[in-house]
């Protein structure tokens, strides 16, 4: 739009949650550079839908997603501008590629309401116990790339037993909710007792605000969800976009990421929560999108019954 172009020094960032982190990074960058940042924050699904809808007149300069997959998809489509940040040295190799890099990392766990009157779960399969009958929610893998990753990770580590587990959870009354927040809210409010595969940082924030929740990472393993940042090739402000990514990866920017209860992408920035070395991380590499589609279809069919 003409309005946006009239301000030569405006940068538009489309980002998944948390909104408070996006605002904090935008204001920190603005203070440092004088570049005004416009933020559009929504779920990854909504952010991606908006990008698709704006193809004829692209608005976003920088995209921060909650799903590594979206970055790989846009890379394949040739939408991304290659960029190596000077601050990328401290970011592990598996969290960066030629045209996207992690802002931070979350992991999926069991989020349990400690006042629910249920025994504290330690393992995924504990949620199939009679104590958890009709008391478990899970985010919808059709709406959450990380939830689909968890299904794939468990299938990779457990083989056919993973599907036995999903079947037993279904028989025990597990409900497939919408995105992460919709799965966590009933557990926080006490209507349900536990979430199978919730995003950790959101619940750490809730705990800090006094909620009676606990985040549990099963020893058998879980999956991580690195949050990729990328610059769109259509950006009219590639210089400012690169400077923004440099800022997010600076010690100051990464401290803000840590304040949001995420794991920083940089190894040399302290976190307020367990880091990767405390987790058993399951591999989620699958044979591309067809495999993802097959796992999603099988799960959706199981839970539609």
Residue ranges and their predicted role:
Residues 273-305:
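Extracellular/periplasmic bilobal clamshell ligand-binding domains
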Residues 37-43, 64-65, 173-179, 215-217:
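Short beta-strand-to-loop elements that line the ligand-binding cleft
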Residues 10-73:
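Early extracytoplasmic/lumenal segment of secretory-pathway proteins
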Residues 16, 20-22, 58-191:
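Extracytoplasmic ligand-binding site segments that recognize negatively charged/polar headgroups
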Residues 109-116, 155, 225-237, 256:
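A bilobed periplasmic-binding-protein/Venus flytrap-type ligand-binding module shared by bacterial periplasmic
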Residues 93, 106, 166-170, 176-177, ...:
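Periplasmic-binding protein-like
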Residues 69-73, 193-212, 255:
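A ligand-binding cleft/hinge motif common to bilobed small-molecule-binding domains
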């Amino acid at each position: 739009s003409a309005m946006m172009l009239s301000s030569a020094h405006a940068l538009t960032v489309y980002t998944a949650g948390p909104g408070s982190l996006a605002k904090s990074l935008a204001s920190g960058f603005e203070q440092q550079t004088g570049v005004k940042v416009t933020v559009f924050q929504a779920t990854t699904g909504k952010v991606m839908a908006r990008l698709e809808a704006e193809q004829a007149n692209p608005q976003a300069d920088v995209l921060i997603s909650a799903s590594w997959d979206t970055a790989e998809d846009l890379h394949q489509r040739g939408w991304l501008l290659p960029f190596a940040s000077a601050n990328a040295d401290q970011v592990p190799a598996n969290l960066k590629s030629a045209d996207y890099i992690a802002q931070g990392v979350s992991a999926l766990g069991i989020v349990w309401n400690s006042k629910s009157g249920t025994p504290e779960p330690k393992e995924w399969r504990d949620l199939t116990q009679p104590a958890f009958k009709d008391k478990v929610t899970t985010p919808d893998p059709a709406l959450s790339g990380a939830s689909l990753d968890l299904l794939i990770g468990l299938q990779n580590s457990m083989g056919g037993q993973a599907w036995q587990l999903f079947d037993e959870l279904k028989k025990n009354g597990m409900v497939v909710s919408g995105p992460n927040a919709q799965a966590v809210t009933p557990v926080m409010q006490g209507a349900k007792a536990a979430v199978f595969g919730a995003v950790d940082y959101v619940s750490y924030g809730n705990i800090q605000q006094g909620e009676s929740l606990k985040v549990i990472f099963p020893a058998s393993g879980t999956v991580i969800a690195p949050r990729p940042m990328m610059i769109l090739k259509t950006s009219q402000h590639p210089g400012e976009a690169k400077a923004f990514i440099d800022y997010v990866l600076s010690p100051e920017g990464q401290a803000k990421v840590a304040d949001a209860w995420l794991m920083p992408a940089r190894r040399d920035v302290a976190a307020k929560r367990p880091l990767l070395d405390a987790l058993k991380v399951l591999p989620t590499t699958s044979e591309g999108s067809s495999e993802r589609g097959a796992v999603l279809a099988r799960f959706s069919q199981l839970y539609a019954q």
